[in-house]
Curated annotation (Swiss-Prot):
Function: Forms part of the ribosomal stalk which helps the ribosome interact with GTP-bound translation factors.
Alphabetical list of HAMAP family matching this protein: Ribosomal_uL11
Domain of life: Bacteria
Protein name in UniProt: Large ribosomal subunit protein uL11
A Pfam family this chain is assigned to: Ribosomal_L11
Record-linked Gene3D superfamilies: Ribosomal protein L11, C-terminal domain, Ribosomal protein L11/L12, N-terminal domain
Keyword annotations: Methylation, Ribonucleoprotein, Ribosomal protein, RNA-binding, rRNA-binding
CDD domains: Ribosomal_L11
Length: 143
């Protein structure tokens, strides 16, 4: 018989830097889950990823106080800012452009994000990422 699911917890945790402090501790503590067990498992699983890169994680909490978690790819905005070498997007994206990205750069980001997007193919994924870039005030070439 399958375990009874108590709930889902969605967090953004820096890769390799999970610790019991907020937001992880309180979120897991409310469900009675072992915080240190999650931190050790998360840090072990994110060992090969750039330290400090925020990763979305979905934790499934079960009635017997056990859990499983699924790592997602980093948010598109984080990857776009990294590729464009900027700290933040434009406060007025359609009036002020802060950077330029080429189609090749967007394809690299789309390859990372494609498993988390609902895009039917790679071209659709690139267009989705291009839309995110435009909404941040980044000029997109070749799309």
């Amino acid at each position: 018989m399958a375990k009874k699911i108590v709930g889902f917890i969605k967090l953004q945790v820096p890769a390799g830097k999970a610790n019991p402090s907020p937001p992880i501790g309180p979120a897991l503590g409310q469900r009675g889950l072992n915080i240190m067990e999650f931190c050790k498992a998360f840090n072990a699983q994110t060992q090969g990823i750039e330290p400090g890169l925020k990763l979305p994680v979905v934790i499934t909490a079960y009635a017997d106080k056990s859990f499983t978690f699924i790592l997602k790819s980093p948010p598109a905005s984080v990857l776009l800012k990294k590729a464009a070498k900027i700290d933040k997007g434009s406060p007025r994206p359609h009036l002020e452009k802060v950077a330029k990205l080429t189609r090749a750069q967007l394809e690299e980001i789309a390859k990372i994000k494609v498993k988390d997007l609902t895009a039917a193919n790679m071209d659709a994924a690139v267009r989705t990422i291009a839309g995110s870039a435009r909404s941040m005030g980044i000029n997109v070439e070749g799309v």
